[in-house]
Amino acid sequence: MRLAVSRERTGLNHSIDKVLTRAGPVGSRQTADHQLISPVRASASGAPQCRLSRCSQFNASCDPRLNLLPGFGYITADVPFYPFSPTITAELTFVSQSADESTETVADALRNDPRLAQAKRLVAEAIGDHASRLSVRPAAESLKSGFADLIDRLSAVRGGPPIWPYLSSGLGRGPYVELADGSVKLDFICGIGVHGAGHSDPGMVAAAIDAAIEDTVMQGNLQQNPASVVMMEKLTALAQASGAELPHCLLSTSGAMANENALKIAMHHKTPADRVLAFDNAFAGRTFAMATLTDRPNYRMGLPLTFPVDYLPFRDPANPERSTRWAVDELHRLLKRHPGRYAAFWAEPIAGEGGYYPGSHEFFTALCQPLKDAGVPIIFDEVQSFSRTSRPFAFQHYGLDAFADIVTVGKITQVCATLYSSEMKPTGPILSQTFTGATASIATGIEMLNRLESNNCFGPSGQNMQMASSFQDGLANLATKYPDLVRGPYGEGMMVAFTPGDGSFDFAKKLMMHLFDIGLLGFVCGGDPTRIRFLPPPATTTQAHIDHAIELLDQGLATLP
C-alpha cells in the first residue's frame, strides 16, 4: 500500500519515499507523509483492506466517507499552492472486510474511474483552447443573416420578440460570452445574477459532467441523490453561521417557487391570518401568487389578486432617518388596523427590481422588532442578493440574523431553496414537489458555493466588496465626466446601478441597447427613476474586468446617438 501524489496538470506521478508494504491488524493505523511543492491531488491506492480515515494539509482535508475499493481506489483532496511547501499526511485505518463486502457502491467506482478524470481533463483543455480566443468584438458579417433568422424564429415561437437579440453560441470565458452571430460581450448581468462563475467555467463544466453520469436528469421530493443532502446542508450551515436559526431547507426549481413555499410555510403557521406586508416596488416572481405580491400592476394585468398585500415605503439612502420614520409609522398604523391578520412580512434586504436600494441594520431593526413583537413571521427574499455582499446572505451583512424566520435563495445557487426555522416547520404535508431541481443544477450549485468561498468573496475586505468599491468608483468618475447622462452609483456590494439621463424607461433602454451593441451587458431596473444595473459574476470577476466595463461604459456614453 502507498500514498500517491499525482500532478493533475502534467500527468506526472510521484510516490512517497516511505512505502507501507503490508496491512496491519484490524483497527491499527499507519501514516504516510509527502511534501507538496505545487497544487496536486492526493490519493491512496493499492490497499485491499484499508480506508483513508484522515488526510490533512493545513486547511484542506479528504472526505473520509469515500472508502477505497478492494485493491484499487482513489480519495482526492484539492491542495492549494503554498510557497513554504507543506506536508500532506494520510492516516489509514485497516478494517475487516469479507470477500463479498465492498466499502463503496458500484456508482462510487464509476465516479472514481480514472477514465472519467481523463475525459474531464480533455474537455477542459478543449474548452480552454477555444475560449482563449474570445474578447469583445462585433458580429461576423457571415453570421448576421443566419442569426437574424434565429431571432425571428425565437420571436415567433415565444409569441413576441426578446428584449435584446441574445442567443449564445454556447461558449464563453469568465464574464465574456460569444453570441451565435460571432460577437463577444462582457456579460455583467449574467442572466440577472444566475451565472456567478461566468461562462464555460471549468469547475462548473466538471460538476455538470459529474451530474451527467448520474442515473437521472432530475431530482424530486420522492427520489433524490446524496448531492441534494449536501446542497441543503451547505445552505443551512451558511445561513446559521452567525446566529440565525434556519435548520430546514427545501430545494425548488425557481426563485418564484422558493417564495411560494415561503409564503405557504408562513400562512400555514399563522392560519387564519391572510394578509402580507411588503415594500413598495417589491418584486417576488412571476407565478400567480407572486404577481399579487409584486408591486407592479402591469405584471398582473388581467389577473385577480390571490391575497391582500399592504406596502411600506423602503429606505431612502438620501433621507435614511426620515424614510425609516415613515416606514415605521405606516407599519404601526397597519398593525393596528388589521390586528392578527398578517401572516408574513416579505422583504428583499436590498431592493433588486425596485432599483437597487440598499437596506441597513437600523432600518430593518426598526421594522422587524415590532413585527417580532406582534408575532408576524419575517421572510427575507435573497434570490438576487445572496452571495453579493460581505457575507453569504445580505441579512447577515446587515446583522439581521435574529429576525430571519424564513429565507429564500436562487439564481446564483443554480438550484433554488427555502430555508426556515424549527418554529416554522409545517405540521401538515403542504410542501412537496415533483422536481426539486435538475441533477446538474444541484451539482453545479455545490460547486458554486465552494467557489464563492475559495475565491474569498466574503468579508469586509473580501473580493465582493473590493470589486464593488472599484466599480462604484469608476461609475462615480463617469458621473463627473457625464453629469447629464450618469447619476449614482447606487446599490450594495456586487449589485451596482446608475440612473441614466432623465431616468425615463425609454432613455434607459436606449442606452442599454447601445451598450449591448458596443459589447457590455447590463439591464434596466426600477420605475421612477429607471436605472441600469449590473450583476458581475462574483466567482470570476477581476479588476481587469471592472476596468474593461468602465472603458466600455465610457465609450457608450461618448457615442450615444
Model-assigned labels for residue ranges:
Residues F84, A90-P561:
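Conserved N-terminal phosphate-binding loop of PLP-dependent enzymes in the Aspartate aminotransferase
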Residues R41-S43, M512:
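Compositionally biased low-complexity segments enriched in histidine and/or tyrosine
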Residues G11, G24-G27, G46, G71-G73:
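Residue-identity detector for glycine
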